[in-house]
């Protein structure tokens, strides 16, 4: 057994033990971290002349300018990495240990420093739970433990690169979730079925069902809380179809079954099927580069058609 493989297996076993202590929570990998940060950028980065200023600070996890916009961005990230729980209005310090132990072979984070960081977070008490309240509560800890928290939460590029190299199961940068999932569902013998899937044919094959389940999870249509229709509605809005929300929710609520392929089939057999294809394609395109919208790109039907033709050509 190679040293790298042994390390990965040891980490996996340790994570399993820790997960049993902290419910069912798993440490977040680099792909998950990138998604969380990019989504918080999308939802909080302002338009206008100061957009670049905010982006230049936030990308380095420098919580400036000190205003409501930055406060809400910080709260978004803290909730996203599940260090802060908005429902209970409490910080989850135990998860720092789980995150650290899972990747410390790659991060090199000091155990004592991480323990101090965890202790500091455990002592935090939140009041109203507003953006400013959460921000001001966490800020002193952020300033004191900026560097170690960056390591623990895989925000250092060199650390993420090591993990990508060691773990082939993490989706790569520049790879769409459709491509990532297809590699795990189909092989050369079932390539024809994969091509049909690119054309939105409902073949009902086990491979297609596995691929759709994988994609739905990658697109966050299914998350740790189960099926997430809000995420699908969001994708319709991003192709400039907000008026379809009632229809989309109606289709999903009436869909028999609770599996990804069943929801996928319901949408493709509904009166919103063509718009769903566009929304699904646009999500695939954005999954290649999580900063797609942050960079100022918008839905462009002609460009999307061109990019999907390229993706189809790789399979068909």
Curated annotation (Swiss-Prot):
One of its GO terms (cellular component) is extracellular space. It is found in: Secreted. The keyword Metal-binding does not apply. Pfam families: PBP_GOBP. SUPFAM superfamilies: Insect pheromone/odorant-binding proteins (SSF47565). Keywords: Disulfide bond, Secreted, Signal. It comes from the Eukaryota. CDD domains: PBP_GOBP. Disulfide bonds join 40-76, 72-131, 181-214, 255-266. GO terms for biological process: sensory perception of smell. InterPro entries: PBP/GOBP, PBP_GOBP_sf. Gene3D superfamilies: Pheromone/general odorant binding protein domain. One of its GO terms (molecular function) is odorant binding. Residues 1-23 form the signal peptide. Modulates blood feeding of female mosquitoes on vertebrate species by binding and sequestering different mediators involved in the host response, such as biogenic amines and eicosanoids. Binds serotonin, tryptamine, histamine, leukotriene C4, leukotriene D4 and leukotriene E4. Does not bind octopamine, dopamine, noradrenaline, adrenaline and prostaglandin PGF2alpha. Belongs to the PBP/GOBP family. This is Long form salivary protein D7L1. The lineage of its organism: Eukaryota, Metazoa, Ecdysozoa, Arthropoda, Hexapoda. The gene is D7L1.
């Amino acid at each position: 057994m190679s040293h790298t493989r042994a390390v990965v297996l040891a980490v996996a076993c340790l994570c399993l033990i820790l997960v049993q202590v902290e419910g069912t929570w798993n440490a977040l990998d680099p792909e998950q971290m990138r998604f969380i940060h990019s989504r918080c950028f999308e939802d909080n980065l302002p338009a206008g002349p100061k957009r670049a200023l905010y982006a230049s600070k936030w990308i380095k996890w420098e919580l400036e300018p000190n205003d409501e916009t930055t406060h809400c961005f910080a709260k978004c990230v803290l909730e996203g990495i599940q260090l802060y729980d908005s429902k209970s209005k409490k910080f989850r310090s135990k998860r720092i240990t789980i995150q650290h132990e899972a990747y410390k072979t790659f991060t090199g984070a000091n155990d004592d420093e991480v323990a101090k960081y965890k202790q500091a977070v455990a002592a935090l008490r939140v009041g109203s739970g507003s953006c400013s309240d959460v921000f001001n509560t966490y800020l002193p800890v952020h300033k004191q433990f900026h560097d170690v928290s960056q390591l623990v939460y895989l925000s250092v590029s060199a650390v993420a690169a090591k993990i990508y190299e060691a773990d082939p199961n993490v989706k790569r940068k520049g790879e769409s979730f459709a491509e990532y999932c297809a590699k795990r569902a189909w092989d050369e013998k079932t390539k024809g079925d994969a091509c049909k899937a690119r054309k939105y044919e409902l073949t009902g094959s086990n491979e297609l069902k596995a691929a759709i389940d994988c994609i739905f999870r990658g697109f966050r249509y299914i998350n740790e809380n189960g099926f997430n229709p809000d995420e699908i509605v969001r994708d319709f809005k991003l192709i400039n179809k907000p008026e379809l929300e009632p229809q989309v929710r109606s289709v999903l609520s009436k869909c028999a079954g609770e599996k990804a392929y069943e929801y996928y089939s319901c949408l493709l057999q509904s009166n919103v099927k063509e718009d769903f294809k566009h929304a699904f394609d646009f999500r695939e395109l954005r999954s290649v580069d999580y900063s797609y919208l942050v960079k100022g790109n918008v839905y462009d039907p002609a460009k999307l058609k061109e990019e999907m033709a390229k993706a189809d050509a790789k399979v068909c």
